[in-house]
A protein has these predicted regions:
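Glycine-enriched, solvent-exposed interface loops adjoining structured elements
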Residues: 1-113, 150-151, 168, 186-333
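Autoprocessing Asn-cyclization modules and mimics
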Residues: 110-189
Length: 333
């Protein structure tokens, strides 16, 4: 698939240069691109709510005109699963990239823990001290979580694809960094007996814990969002009962933010930047191709404000309003 970010940048520069509005540097473009993508991403949820209201009012379409289905597919593409690392007795850090929490599950059945052997590559997990086959508990389909506290990929999850030997597994995704200071600790969890942890308010948890009849237990655990520590405030959860402390057993399913776009380049002898898709920090937009026009319009608006060129901002706004008008149904008919 062709790079969306390069097409968007070329179009933005073409429009901006047509009337001598000024040059947009790669660094400035990346800043505008990040904000534009965030604006559109957050608007998905407002659109979803709006179309649900229209559906209830029987003014939405079906089949190819089912806008809600398309929005759900886009939002679901940002769904992620990640194990939570506990930073206190029952205090767990939420993922850095979470936008909203879908659900948090408790995996009570731990089948194996260990430390990766240096040299694990690709989608393989090698632990020279493990006993995957003879132990008889590890099986394909089980969840494996990176439990390294403070690691580069801490909390990253994957599934066991196959048990290759006593010391080697094939996993669906390599969420471990096996350098000399890499992420090496893991936990393997059975998918049987998984319990959803119910979210409750700070006020409700006080009353639940005040009576032995309502206190959360392992069969009906609960969590409070926004428990604080000396590092993070509002990006943690407190899980009850306090006995749920085993690393990797609390797993979140959430909608993440899109990754920051980054138009990367190599500098030519004349000083002109040349698009370089092979750069290690290259990142395309994560939005669907259908949002390419929206990205262009929003970036033009930000660029116009930056160079104090009101006509460029107005052009982007006018194009965006035109698109919104075409996409909105006429509710008065």
């Amino acid at each position: 698939m062709a790079s969306i970010i390069n097409t968007v940048r070329a179009t933005v520069l073409s429009i901006a240069n047509k009337n001598n509005y000024g040059y947009i540097t790669p660094n400035d473009f990346n800043l505008y691109a990040k904000q534009a993508q965030l604006d559109i991403f957050e608007d998905y949820f407002y659109q979803y709510n709006s179309w649900i209201v229209k559906q209830n009012a029987r003014v939405s379409g079906s089949d190819y005109a089912d806008i809600i289905k398309g929005l759900v597919e886009v939002i679901d593409s940002f769904s992620s699963t990640k194990g939570l690392i506990n930073t206190g007795i029952n205090l767990f850090d939420l993922p850095d990239d979470y936008y909203l929490i879908d659900k948090i599950n408790y995996y009570p059945n731990l089948t194996a823990t260990g430390t990766l052997t240096f040299g694990s590559i690709g989608n393989t997990l090698i632990d020279s001290a493990a006993n995957f086959i003879n132990g008889g508990q590890v099986a394909p389909g089980q969840l494996i979580v990176n439990t390294t506290a403070g690691g580069l990929y801490s909390g990253g999850s994957a599934f066991v694809v196959s048990v290759d030997s006593n010391t080697q597994l094939t996993i669906s995704t390599n969420n471990f960094f096996t350098g000399s200071f890499g992420d090496t600790s893991y936990a393997i969890l059975s998918t049987k007996g998984v319990t959803e942890i119910e979210r409750v308010s700070q006020n409700k948890i006080f009353y639940l814990n005040s009576s032995p009849l309502t206190t959360p237990g392992l069969s009906f655990p609960a969590y409070v969002l926004g428990g604080a520590n000396n590092i993070n405030t509002g990006n943690t959860i407190t899980v009850y009962p306090e006995s749920i402390v085993t690393a990797g057993t609390v797993v979140s399913q959430y909608i993440r933010y899109p990754k920051d776009p980054n138009w990367t380049y190599a500098t030519l002898a004349a000083g002109e930047p040349l698009f370089d898709e092979s750069a290690s920090d290259y990142q395309d937009f994560e939005l669907p191709l259908s949002d390419q026009v929206n990205l262009i319009n929003k970036i033009l608006q930000y660029a116009g404000m930056s160079i104090r060129e009101i006509s460029l901002t107005q052009f982007g706004q006018a194009q965006e309003q035109m698109d919104d008008t075409q996409q909105s149904p006429n509710l008065t008919s």
